[in-house]
Swiss-Prot record:
It comes from Lachesana tarabaevi (Spider). GO terms for cellular component: extracellular region. The keyword Oxidoreductase does not apply. The presence of a 'disulfide through disulfide knot' structurally defines this protein as a knottin. It is found in: Secreted. This is Latartoxin-2a. Residues 1-19 form the signal peptide.
Length: 109
């Protein structure tokens, strides 16, 4: 009997801790989204070229660059030249966080 009570208390504690973690995780994702939508002044703006990477050539041919675009809160698009590896890593991270968030919400909801 004591074991069942202890298990029940552990489950209740675990559930409340998990719900707090999920709330924190959801707010963290929202913070990331709003942060990503904030536009900043650009030094290597390639918006006029969109995804045409001619504006992102490296004269020393040391790195490959991509024109990466986001849509800001105002609906305005902003594009910058970034290293290809950075853009690809960022996209993998975004997809991973999105999948984890969906799975957590699916399990809870």
């Amino acid at each position: 009997m004591k074991v069942l009570v202890i298990i029940a208390l552990c489950l209740v504690a675990f559930q409340s801790a998990l719900s707090k973690k999920i709330e924190n995780f959801e707010s963290y994702i929202e913070d990331l989204k709003s942060e990503a939508r904030e536009c900043i002044p650009l030094y290597n703006d390639c918006t006029a070229f969109k995804y045409n990477n001619n504006c992102c050539k490296d004269p020393e041919k040391k790195y490959q660059y991509k024109c990466s675009c986001i849509v800001c809160k105002e609906g305005k698009e902003q594009c910058t030249c970034q290293r290809k590896e950075t853009v690809e890593s960022m996209m993998k991270c975004v997809r991973f966080v999105k999948k984890v968030g969906e799975k957590v919400i699916e399990k809870v909801g």
